[in-house]
């Protein structure tokens, strides 16, 4: 099992790289074989150092056998022996000297093949010339080995003696005279050293083979996970595509329903006009027939016949044509249009919110490395509408608008607070209600906005439309409720508690509680008109309902050739300007509203610094005939 391999590394001595044999623990917390650490410190001498972390000990620590580590090593060895091998692979055996050796010539006759090498005579002999080593007592103590090709390699270059020992500490073969220089080492015979190293290498091969198998399985696992990710994302993309298809279907159904209602309204009004037309045609035909009969009688010369027919026609009377007042149901049309506008606003807001979350997610690091991640289809409307419900002001009339994939909003209620637009990076962050910005920060933010270009201001652009429920009866609204002017006659709007009754004013449909918002108004024949903002609680009746003449409204006003800024019935005369477009920047978070004169560039007209306490509405005043205020599109 591959999971045992990391444990084998943890249970290996860092000196001999083998499993612990009688493990001991140093005061610094590292484990070694007792023999390995003892030999290391004997060679090293004081001061003593830990072979792993190199911590210095002036006095050699007393080492005790780590019984817990011994038990762990024993359990590991038992698990290694008991576990079923992954495969039947075993390390290849090392070839013996006899099988590995090639044919060596006899050093005596140089023709026959040697059968033995004498390590004392330092020569190889064939069977014939080897006989003295068996027959003569003088050669009986000479050690014989299988034929060795290069005997010179076995000789010590320093002492010219045969190297018959191996020093594991220095990793080299030595002769008996070299032992003087290796007093602290633990030399062994070549056969013993060869057997030990062969055992270690066989273990190393086993571990390497296991590691290679582990790497192979890891590669397969990575490929498998890669395929799982690909399959999972394919499914998720298909689900996402299905969600968007359903949303498109909902929008298509809403469009079809809205167009059908408009068609029905058109058919209703058109049918009434058609009926009236048929009645008028019939009435006209009757009047033309009567006219022809009268003209015919007038041509009669016979008085008796004239009197007889004239008396009969005298009883037939005609009445002037009357056309009953027939008009489209503007409330219905406005409701349908506002429903579509609300739907578009909800979608834009949800998409921006989703993009913002995605940017924040990418900025904080990629957390999607897990193969099995939670996937939730995008359904932006529910949370957004819930926010809109909580942001509705108490003075705002009308029902709240709802949006869901299955139901189209029927009408955007006046007073719905629009969520603030995302600000640009150079703008100051939002101020919380619990911790208002300091005066210095507010002043810095205000100064920052006073130096912005029109292009930068348009980053905060919001679409404003007039709320016909607030329009005075002398104010005429047109162009999809984006143009206001003074009408010649009363508009006969239906009664509404939010409607202005004293001043010819109108408010924007939506209010703003937080964030930064910018809109522009085009003035045609800019005389006797005003542009500003107000609380929803501003009076609707009496002189105090006039824009700027109360503590709940702020405006810039054109009166004849004079331009003034008004608030709480206090007037501030402003320099005249030829600009016909006014830009209004409202910063709810930092408490100020700025009025700009917009030409090719923007120029400051006036600014109010206020700690706003309620939701704010765009507000407009028109008084002079011919004066028109038009909300500009971006």
UniProtKB/Swiss-Prot annotation:
There is a cross-link at residue 116 (Glycyl lysine isopeptide (Lys-Gly) (interchain with G-Cter in ISG15)). Residues 444-634 form the B30.2/SPRY domain. A zinc finger (RING-type) spans 13-54. Residues 353-437 are annotated as: Disordered. Ubiquitous. Pathway: Protein modification; protein ubiquitination. InterPro entries: B30.2/SPRY, B30.2/SPRY_sf, Butyrophylin_SPRY, ConA-like_dom_sf, E3_ubiq-ligase_TRIM/RNF, PRY, SPRY_dom, TRIM25_SPRY_PRY. CDD domains: Bbox1_TRIM25-like_C-IV (cd19842), Bbox2_TRIM25_C-IV (cd19776), RING-HC_TRIM25_C-IV (cd16597), SPRY_PRY_TRIM25 (cd13736). Keywords: Acetylation, Antiviral defense, Coiled coil, Cytoplasm, Immunity, Innate immunity, Isopeptide bond, Ligase, Metal-binding, Nucleus, Phosphoprotein, Transferase, Ubl conjugation, Ubl conjugation pathway, Zinc, Zinc-finger. This is E3 ubiquitin/ISG15 ligase TRIM25. It comes from Mus musculus. The gene is Trim25.
